[in-house]
């Protein structure tokens, strides 16, 4: 049986892994487009749920699942939550996102 692990990455960890290395980023993008062209990527439209507030629908969260095949073979989902109220409140982020692979 394969042991499962959870690894939480902070922004610093992602940067250290090469996020700001444009050669590495472009190589990953090129590979992604190649796999997409071969039909190896499943990327359905996002599902959006609006959250009502006292005045109108100004907040929402989205789920964006995807699967990358080929030699990568990994599935994941991005959850994104946006709040107009947060955007008008100093000191807190407009949106909070999480990617699960």
Where are these regions (language model features)?
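N-terminal ligand-binding/catalytic initiation module
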Residues: 1-101
């Amino acid at each position: 049986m394969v042991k499962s692990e959870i690894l939480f990455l902070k922004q610093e960890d992602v940067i250290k892994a090469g996020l700001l290395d444009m050669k590495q980023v472009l190589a990953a993008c090129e590979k992604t487009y190649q796999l997409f062209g071969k039909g190896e990527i499943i990327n359905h439209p996002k599902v959006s749920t609006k959250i009502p507030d006292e005045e109108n629908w100004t907040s929402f969260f989205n789920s964006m699942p995807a699967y990358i095949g080929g030699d990568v073979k990994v599935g994941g989902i991005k959850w994104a939550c946006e709040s107009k109220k947060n955007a008008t409140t100093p000191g807190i982020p407009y949106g909070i996102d999480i990617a699960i692979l």
